[in-house]
Amino acid sequence: YKFGIHDQYRDYYHAAPSYDENYACRLPDRTIPGHSYWAGGPQSYLCATQAPFYVKRNFAELKKNGIRLDGAYLDVFTCNEGDECANPEHVMTRRDCYTYRGNCFSWLLSQGILSSSEEVSDWAVPYLVFCHYAPYDFMLRPAETPKKGIPVPLFNLVYHDCVIEPWMMDHVSKDEDYMLYALLAGGAPYLVRDGAYPNTDGAFDGEKISLEEMTERCRVVTELHEKT
């Protein structure tokens, strides 16, 4: 097994001891956008100009304490658009934001840590070893929801050799088994995929599969993935 952690350098929670609104993204009118949607409570967004510092600080501390990582998942960097910041002390364009996010991934790789993030975006392909997933749009909706259009497997096949993409393996209904899409794309399987929140990110109740059966299904997909 490989050992990695789930980490985050965008959601900037006000309850954090290190929170400083001067490092939060500002709009041109000098207001600081934010919300309280996630479990961490009120938050704004950390300006990505600051992210490399915190990545290096935190991972250096982990190493100092004897924690050796094989991989790290920097959440949301690749599934959210680039941020902008109008703070005159650290002005940032969206292009700049992608560069700073890329610097975080590059630093991980320089330390021998496999880099990962939520989905895949074209700007991030040079920096990622694997991702959380890259599902088709309909996989993020309940199984009975009508499909919209025809999915184009850009990252799943065109960039197949560039990024390892774990696939959902849910048997969502008697007529739909996502394992078949994993086989079709020669992708990697997801053995256990628990959503952080109910009914979000494709984490719906479907056909229940035992761990033993899911392990066997994953073995089949893995054997094909190793050949592609």
Regions found by a protein language model. Give the residues of each.
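Substrate-binding/active-site clefts of carbohydrate-active enzymes
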Residues: 2-53, 137
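Active-site-proximal substrate-binding groove within the catalytic cores of carbohydrate-active enzymes
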Residues: 34, 38, 46-70, 78-228
